[in-house]
């Protein structure tokens, strides 16, 4: 924020941050993805953060000892946001195959496949964290939509069955707890005793 006056002024805001400070192996360096948006339409949030010839972002990179930083444009449209999050890869299409489960297929040309995935999966992993979506990178020249949709439909069906079973179990547990509470309340009710007159012996 200190390097970008527009953030301090409020015309640019940071929407989300995904950082991998300790990658799974030494061959992959630390990396951060930052999603930004502008309050004012005429302000370019990405340009404001990067600065002229990368001057602003370079200062941040230097402070973080060379950590790679991707500044991407946030979007209300999940498909566009996912495409932006995979920068610097070029995306051909984003298919939101399961909006409820937040699962997307991202189609990229063959020459962009490794870039979209990133070394040891770092790029797509950070994109998924940033957007909150499960992202599957697909080769656009080999993508079989019908086959992929069938697989997704099966996964959705399994999820719905699991959710139904979970709901049934929760309802059963709630009913058992209610019955137990009712029984406990009944047992705690005070017992009233009726005093009967003591029997008297007849006098002869």
Feature-to-residue mapping (PLM):
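Single conserved hydrophobic/aromatic residue that forms the stacking wall/gate
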Residues: 195, 200-204
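RNA-contacting regions in translation and RNA-metabolism proteins
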Residues: 1-196
């Amino acid at each position: 924020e200190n390097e970008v006056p527009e953030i301090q002024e409020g015309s640019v805001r940071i929407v989300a941050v995904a950082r991998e400070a300790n990658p799974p192996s030494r061959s992959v360096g630390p990396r951060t993805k930052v999603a930004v948006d502008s309050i004012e339409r005429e302000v370019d949030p990405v340009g404001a953060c990067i600065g002229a010839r990368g001057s602003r972002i370079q200062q941040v990179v230097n402070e973080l000892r060379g950590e790679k930083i991707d500044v991407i444009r946030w979007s209300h449209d999940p498909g566009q946001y996912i495409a932006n999050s995979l920068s610097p890869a070029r995306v051909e299409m984003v298919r939101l195959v399961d909006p409820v489960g937040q699962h997307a297929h991202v189609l990229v040309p063959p020459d962009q496949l490794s870039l979209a995935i990133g070394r040891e999966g770092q790029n797509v992993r950070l994109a998924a964290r940033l957007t909150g979506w499960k992202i599957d990178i697909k080769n656009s020249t080999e993508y079989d939509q019908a086959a992929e949709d069938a697989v997704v439909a099966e996964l959705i069906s399994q999820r719905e069955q699991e959710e139904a079973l979970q709901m049934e179990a929760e309802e059963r547990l709630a009913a058992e707890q209610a019955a137990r509470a009712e029984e406990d309340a009944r047992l705690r009710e005070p017992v009233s005793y009726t005093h009967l007159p003591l029997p008297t012996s007849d006098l002869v």
